[in-house]
Swiss-Prot record:
The entry's keywords: 4Fe-4S, Cytoplasm, Iron, Iron-sulfur, Metal-binding, S-adenosyl-L-methionine, Transferase
Source species of the chain: Chlorobium limicola (strain DSM 245 / NBRC 103803 / 6330)
Superkingdom, natural source: Bacteria
PANTHER family: LIPOYL SYNTHASE, LIPOYL SYNTHASE, MITOCHONDRIAL
Domain Radical SAM core intervals: 50-266
Gene name for this UniProt entry: lipA
Protein name, UniProt field: Lipoyl synthase
Lineage, broadest ranks: Bacteria, Pseudomonadati, Chlorobiota, Chlorobiia, Chlorobiales
Subcellular location: Cytoplasm
Coiled-coil annotated residue ranges, if any: none
Amino acids binding [4Fe-4S] cluster 1: 38, 43, 49, 277
């Protein structure tokens, strides 16, 4: 039985509203033909974020070379080449939106020799050239385990280096067949050990994991010197995606938060609608970003 089609609990019902910035944000992003993870990944927080004039920019197109079963982003083996004007367009959007903190992410581009890392670098530099005061969070893919490609992005010294483990290792074959749990942990640890970046990761719950497995993964992240963690409810994007196994209660999310804090994470967000880039600017505003 597809549990996602059961009645959702009250805590998962959103009141949709649009503020004064919503239409302006939508018009700006559409006019520049920019991709956002908000729209491409069917994020439940799109209304809230766009209404506040914030968005997470998605680099390298809107089509991914991976087939993760939880993700709403379109898939193909051979996407179109990256738009060479995209870095400048994003920089212009950041300036137009008067952002103080910008989150960049991307699809996986296993079809490109550098995994898209050169495009990442161009985007970071374009943003900083036009917006020298802005802080940048990079939510990166694993670059297929090619260290040189990941290093190219880390060398740009983003204020936050984010890479999501997404789920517990036992679910990787079913949920993330082309990814590797240990490889993701190694990327996070390298960002801290070699480049001294503030590190972040996130995971979804409700896909069939146990509480003990979540606790173990939180421990693995801390052992890999991850500073910030986000935990949110998995929601099935379409009938073709992985079904929801169960709805995690707010009390359980609070327990996960307490567990993470006890392990020493410097900042924790845990709740049904938490996503990796949700309220990301708060981490910077609260001065959690330090080179250590």
């Amino acid at each position: 039985m597809n549990r996602e089609r059961q009645k959702k609990p009250e805590w998962l019902k959103l009141k949709l509203s649009t503020g004064e910035h919503f239409a302006a944000t939508r018009q700006l992003l559409s006019g520049l033909r920019l991709n956002t993870v908000c729209r491409s990944a069917m994020c439940p927080n799109l209304q809230e974020c766009w209404s506040k004039g914030t968005a997470t920019f998605m680099l390298l197109g809107s089509v991914c070379t991976r087939t993760c079963r939880f993700c709403a982003v379109d898939k193909t083996v051979l996407p179109v080449p990256p738009d060479p004007e995209e870095p400048e367009k994003i920089a212009l959007a950041v300036k137009s939106m008067s952002l103080k903190h910008v989150v960049l992410t991307s699809v996986n581009r296993d079809d490109l020799p550098d995994g898209g890392s050169g495009h990442w670098v161009s985007s970071i530099r374009s943003i900083r050239s036009l917006n020298p005061e802005v802080s940048i969070e990079c939510l990166v893919p694993d670059f297929d385990g090619i260290t040189a490609n990941a290093d190219r992005v880390m060398q740009e010294a983003p204020e936050v280096l984010n890479h999501n483990i997404e789920t517990v290792p036992s679910l990787y074959p079913a949920v993330r067949p082309q990814a590797d749990y240990r490889r993701s942990l190694e990327l996070i640890e390298r960002a801290k050990a070699v480049f001294r970046l503030s590190t972040k990761s996130g995971m979804m719950v409700g896909m069939g994991e146990t509480g003990d497995e979540v606790a173990a993964s939180l421990g693995d992240l801390r052992a890999s010197r991850c500073d910030i963690v986000t935990i949110g409810q998995y929601l099935q994007p379409t009938a073709a995606h992985l079904p929801v196994n169960r709805y995690v209660t707010p009390d359980e999310f609070e327990e996960y938060k307490n567990r993470a804090e006890s392990l020493g994470f410097r900042h924790v967000q845990s709740g049904p609608f938490v996503r990796s880039s949700y309220h990301a600017e708060e981490f910077v505003a609260a001065r959690h970003i330090e080179r250590c």
